[in-house]
Amino acid sequence: MGIHTAWQDATPLVLFVGLIPISDRDRESFQEFDPKAWFGTQAKQVFVLDDPQRASRVVAEAFFQAQQGRPGPVIVGLPEDILHREFTGTIHPPIQVADGALSDADLNHLSRELTQAQRPLIFAGGPRWTPESAAAITQFAEDNHIPIIQDFRAADRVPFESPANAGWLGYGRDPRAAQLLEEASLVLEVGAVLGDVPTDGYTLRQSTDARNIVISPDTSLRGHSVALERHIVASPVAFTSGLERLNVGGAEAREEWFNTAHANHLDFATLPEPAQYRAGKEGTAHMETVFAALHKQLPKDSLYTFGAGNHCIWAQRFLRSTVYPSQFSVRNGSMGYSVPAAVATKLQFPERTVVTIAGDGEYLMNGQELATALQYGAPFLIIVMSNGEFGTIRDHQKKHFPDRVSGTQLVNPDFAAVARGFGAHGELVTEDSRVPDAIARALAAINNDGVPALINVITDQDLSLPID
């Protein structure tokens, strides 16, 4: 699952896999498998090191392949007997990964087309961004009145409050975001491509007359599904480093287009007032209350992780990113990502507050990684949206087989008590009035005691998604 996640998330990853001795192959040996057959459909490349003298070259090539173009996972198989043999060759230096560049012809073309476009739109996402490149494209878009709409699970390339922020595409998106994509006279795809999820299953922007320019280091443009006018082979870093050489005019003519896109984004991300909440069952709290309290109490540069499920729609819609990177999630719908990702994120960014939003079904997948967080001193906040079901799967059942509940109901443990058993701070919340203080105590445990904190929020099954 981790390899497939890295494949669809375009995450550079090198995995070294221990294998049986060469002499034991094809004999149904204990734990024998063929790594090329096993990983071949979801890795960029699979190596099997049968000669120790090739070790340095293979390792250098593996790290290069994992990073170049569209990043992804690379597998290196290590037969047991090879590991015991001596390497006497020359150490191969790292292979430089090219970022690509904008030619003068590219710059002239982009300057002309963006100036002439009445309704240009930047679609941003994908790998190989830096804080500097994210800031640069935001400034460019603000200066030239070009809205930026972000890819599925990539809503941290542009600060939430930037006037260039036009929201995001993918599951749970604002209907007006789809309209924006359809109405754009020119789309500049930077780092990401308009594939399955952002086009609502290959239904948006499918006209062969649609004008789309792609900025991507991936020469194959894997996943791209719309008409292509021009492909500039460059990473987001290479592209944004050339923005100062672009000469784009006509910003005033795009002001209404620009402002409307941002206003719609803000409207969609605004929480309702408590008087507008949908009635929930007794003994439950509203996720709207949770996010309202998080807005008030979290530092602006907080980092967020979430996995797969209905809880992600809440996180994607209402969490507010201000700097890149600040959002970590998965694009392949694999559950169990949120807690391990929070551990890794806190270790990578120890000075920043890390928050994970998890559903109860998703938390049950890998919640035991709290032990790892305690072991390595990685305190973070966990909000468990606990409604006693696999919500996304149940929603599909309601739609297609409304009277057949099958395999989606959960009997949960007391998540707060389990967290305390690990040595973390744990609280149970069953009503809105307890939410703000529970979050305050949890953050105090993180900041003062240095331990993770979990808040188990009991929610109504009928309120598993935000109101449209």
Where does each model-flagged region fall?
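Glycine-rich, N-terminal phosphate-binding loop of Rossmann-like dinucleotide-binding domains
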Residues: 124, 190-191, 308, 358, ...
